[in-house]
Structure formats: structure tokens, C-alpha cells
Design a protein with these regions (language model features):
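Outer-membrane beta-barrel porins/channels
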Residues: 1-222
């Protein structure tokens, strides 16, 4: 990440950079499968990952040794990780699928998956925390996405050693978009001796993300 500023400086530009490391959470899952005769296959998968346990780290030192091996030392960003723990939560993913094969050279497939929301209710992109991830940020907007649903349908063809797979996928999710976080100042007494609170509140805008995808895969078995 790199950014620059000319505020409070007599030069045209002063630059600084920061290297980060982001450790994603463990993902756990179970799966079940069942066949009916030699024409129908059914499958179900459940996965869970706790995104509140993500670890944002800053690179303190990095180097290559004599054998060209890369090494680095990093430290956790305490305040950013506290914000992550507050804003994000565990996500469950459910995947269901089935395949019908009336002939050895042809297959019909259907699938569905549901992903629960990653964001806690009221999650904010806090621009006031003491973290390089905030210092070097060049945007203030964020979107709290809700659950995601996907539906897929496809067909597969087998020609000798060639295999052709065609699939269509529709995905949909809704969210709340914020151009910036809301700010509330501490109470103060104005010139008329009246207690006041400055408020810069940002109301969210409902947004929707809908996607249509067509996928094609051609493979050859040696």
C-alpha cells in the first residue's frame, strides 16, 4: 500500500509505503454423497469459517537468505484486528448438487449454495483507529453485504477422450452502502450555554449485486 500527502509540507510530495500480511481463518467442512443406481449422483457440503479471527499484520522486516529463500517478520495490528473481530463473524456455506446421467456421454447438473452474511449488524469502516491500514487508505466507502445465494445449471458431454462442460450460474446478494462512517462529537456547551452535540450521520443506501455467468470448460484426457 502506498500513498502521499502535501499537507504541512514545503515539498511537492512526500511519500511513504507499508507492507502488510493478511492471515485468513481456518475453514472446516463436511460433505456427504449418495448415488442412485448408475444414473443419479447427489451431494451436500457444509463449510464454516470465522472471519472475525482474521489477522492483519504489518511486515517489520523481510529479506532473502543466501539460498534465495524469502523470510519475513511481522506483527499483528491490534486495533485493526479488534475492529475486524467486532465487525465480522462466522460464515456458514451450504452447497447442494445433483447430476443425472441418462447416457455415459451426457450429463445434466443442478446446484445451489447459500452463504450467510460475513458482517455483523451495524458494522462500520472505522477511520479513527490507530492503524497503518487507516493511515494509508485512499477511500472511505464500504458496503455491508448480506447473504449470498447461487443457482447453477449445466450439461456435460463426453466424446472419446474429450470432455465439454457448459454451465450457467446466477448469484444474488443485497447490502447497505455507506460513502463514509457516521461521526458524533463529544458534547459541548455553546455560546448560549446550551449543551450541543455535532452529528455527521451517514444513512445507508440499499444496493443489490446480481450476476449472470456462463462457463465453458473443454478438457482432454491423455
Amino acid at each position: 500500500t502506498e500513498n502521499y500527502t502535501t499537507i504541512g509540507s514545503n515539498v511537492d510530495k512526500s511519500a511513504a509505503s507499508e507492507d502488510f500480511r493478511f492471515n485468513t481463518p481456518w475453514k472446516f467442512g463436511i460433505s456427504l454423497g449418495h448415488t442412485i443406481g448408475n444414473q443419479i449422483a447427489l451431494g451436500a457440503v457444509y463449510e464454516y469459517a470465522d472471519y472475525g479471527s482474521c489477522d492483519m499484520r504489518t511486515i517489520d522486516d523481510a529479506y532473502y537468505d543466501y539460498y534465495d529463500g524469502y523470510h519475513e517478520n511481522s506483527s499483528s495490528e491490534f486495533y485493526m484486528n479488534q475492529l475486524t473481530k467486532k465487525n465480522l463473524k462466522g460464515v456458514s456455506t451450504i452447497k447442494l448438487g445433483g447430476e443425472f446421467r441418462p447416457d455415459k456421454s451426457f450429463a445434466i447438473r443442478l446446484g445451489y449454495n447459500h452463504v450467510t452474511p460475513m458482517f455483523n449488524k451495524g458494522a462500520v469502516r472505522d477511520q479513527t483507529i490507530d492503524s497503518p491500514g487507516v493511515y494509508y487508505a485512499s477511500t472511505t466507502d464500504y458496503t455491508n453485504w448480506g447473504a449470498t445465494d447461487r443457482i447453477t445449471a449445466g450439461v456435460g458431454f463426453t466424446f472419446d477422450k474429450f470432455r465439454l462442460d457448459l454451465a450457467y450460474q446466477y448469484s444474488q446478494r443485497n447490502g447497505d452502502f455507506y460513502p463514509f462512517m457516521s461521526y458524533y462529537s463529544a458534547d459541548y456547551i455553546d455560546a448560549d450555554n446550551v449543551r450541543q452535540t455535532e452529528v455527521n450521520e451517514c444513512s445507508p443506501v440499499s444496493v443489490s449485486d446480481k450476476r449472470h455467468q456462463v462457463l465453458c470448460t473443454l478438457s482432454y484426457s491423455f
